[in-house]
């Protein structure tokens, strides 16, 4: 065990060895445990260097990957097409013995046109049938509409005729009343002209019974 004297203590006042020994003994008993050269209880911190966290790069979007893959596929397809053209040009016979590419293209186009014309004929027939069917359906709808209109007009005519007959009856009754009143007036007038005075009608006087 190592002994040490610190500068904090003032040793100028010690005159005897016994006092020095007592002071050393007290300092040894009251000293901090961490002052030992090889302390057992003190935990020595690790001296590992601090490592920074590595930030993982974000994954690119799926669209970018798809575009890259599409580009790679296109490049591969272009390379394959170029190789195929090169091999066909190398293995193809001279133009005198085989028909030209333009002739082949023209023949294929002519065949496609013939096929398209043949396919167009039934399509035209189908469209004509559709037009005829639509025209017939339109005519049938128009006929139904006209029939309904005629029925409604007939109903209106019957109602109007009924109203007119009722009005004629009322007017006839009024005319007959006016005619009767007119005839009464004419008779009174004729009596006044012929007799010169109106007829006196004696009224019976009611007698009260006692």
Swiss-Prot record:
Keyword Thylakoid: no
Biased composition (Basic residues): 49-68
Principal place of residence: virion
Post-translational modification: Phosphorylated at multiple sites. Phosphorylation is necessary for cleavage activity. Phosphorylated by the viral B1R and F10 kinases.
Stretch list, region Disordered: 25-102
UniProtKB keywords: Host cytoplasm, Virion
Described purpose of this protein according to its UniProt entry: Involved in the co-transcriptional or post-transcriptional endoribonucleolytic cleavage that generates sequence-homogeneous 3' ends during late transcription. Involved in postreplicative transcription elongation on intermediate and late genes. Also involved in DNA replication and in multiple steps of virion morphogenesis. Required both for inclusion of virosoplasm into crescents as well as for maturation of immature virions (IV) into mature virions (MV).
Subunit relationships: Interacts with the DNA polymerase processivity factor A20. Interacts with B1R kinase. Interacts with the late transcription factors VLTF-1 and VLTF-3. Interacts with the late transcription elongation factor G2. Interacts with itself. Might be part of a transcription complex composed at least of G2, A18, and H5.
Name the UniProt record assigns to this protein: Late transcription elongation factor OPG110
Source organism of this protein record: Monkeypox virus
């Amino acid at each position: 065990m190592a002994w040490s004297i610190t500068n904090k203590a003032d040793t100028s006042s010690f005159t005897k060895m016994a006092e020095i020994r007592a002071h050393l003994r007290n300092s040894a008993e009251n000293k901090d445990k961490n002052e030992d050269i090889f302390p057992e209880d003190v935990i020595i911190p690790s001296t590992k260097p601090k490592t920074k966290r590595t930030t993982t790069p974000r994954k690119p979007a799926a669209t970018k990957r798809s575009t890259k893959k599409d580009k790679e596929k296109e490049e591969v397809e272009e390379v394959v097409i170029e190789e195929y053209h090169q091999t066909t040009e190398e293995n193809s016979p001279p133009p005198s013995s085989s028909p030209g590419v333009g002739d082949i293209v023209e023949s294929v186009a002519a065949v496609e046109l013939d096929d398209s014309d043949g396919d167009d004929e039934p399509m035209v027939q189908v469209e004509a049938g559709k037009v005829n069917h639509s025209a017939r359906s339109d005519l049938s709808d128009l006929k139904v509409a006209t029939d309904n209109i005629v029925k409604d007009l007939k109903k209106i005519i019957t109602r109007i005729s009924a109203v007119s007959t009722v009005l004629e009856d009322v007017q006839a009754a009024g005319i007959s009343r006016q005619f009767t009143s007119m005839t009464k007036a004419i008779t009174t007038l004729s009596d006044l002209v012929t007799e010169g005075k109106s007829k006196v009608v004696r009224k019976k006087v009611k007698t009260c019974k006692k």
